[in-house]
């Protein structure tokens, strides 16, 4: 009797767990759909002139000013092919004397500190605003003395550059530039959450049906 109760508890625990995983995937599906819609709206929106109080993800903006290459930051990153390198994050001062962190794009690891990555034309830039994502537990600590960063901690960035920035990073859009290669922002994000949800729910139903079958079979025997 005791073993039967333990078995029943275990089966219903597994079913509940898998149902919870399915529900979590539906929550993630809603989040991903909202994200795709938000990015889509930003990509379709006309660019507006940058000002420091803009606090909207994926807002397309235009800014005019100058880069400060002396305080450039190298953020460890993989490109679309999985090759290791760096995102080049450069302070930019607008004509209104506001400071922005510009993600100018990706470079190979051996291009770090090379002069070729700092050749720019003109003072006007266009891009999308992204809210800075805080460091998660899986990322290593920044090696600030080597100017190798794994996450953007604004407190440390402010100390490193001697400037103050808000929590939004400007991602440069310029198809004419190849080094650094600007990140291409699209709405083509992987979205398999519905498939995963159906899988978890299907497993839960299968386990429940097998449980009923074997329980009925044991009663007959």
Regions found by a protein language model. Name each.
Residues 1-52, 59-221:
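Surface-exposed, charge/polar-rich loops and edge strands
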């Amino acid at each position: 009797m005791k073993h039967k109760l333990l078995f029943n508890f275990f089966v219903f625990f597994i079913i509940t767990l898998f149902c919870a995983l399915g529900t979590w995937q539906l929550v993630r599906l809603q989040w991903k759909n909202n994200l795709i819609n938000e990015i889509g709206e930003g990509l379709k929106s006309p660019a507006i002139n940058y000002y420091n109080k803009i606090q909207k993800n994926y807002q397309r903006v235009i800014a005019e000013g100058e880069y400060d290459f002396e305080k450039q930051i190298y953020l460890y990153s993989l490109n679309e092919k999985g090759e290791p390198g760096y995102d080049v994050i450069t302070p930019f001062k607008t004509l209104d004397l506001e400071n922005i962190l510009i993600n100018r794009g990706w470079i190979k690891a051996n291009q770090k500190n090379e002069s070729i990555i700092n050749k720019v034309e003109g003072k006007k830039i266009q891009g999308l605003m992204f809210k800075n994502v805080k460091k998660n537990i899986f990322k290593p600590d920044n090696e600030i003395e080597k100017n190798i960063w794994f996450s953007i901690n604004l407190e440390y960035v402010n100390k490193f550059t001697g400037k103050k920035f808000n929590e939004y990073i400007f991602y440069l859009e310029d198809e004419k530039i190849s080094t650094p290669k600007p990140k291409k922002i699209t709405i083509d994000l992987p979205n398999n959450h519905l498939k995963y949800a159906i899988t978890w729910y299907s497993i839960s139903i299968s386990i429940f049906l097998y449980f009923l079958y074997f329980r009925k079979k044991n009663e007959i025997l």
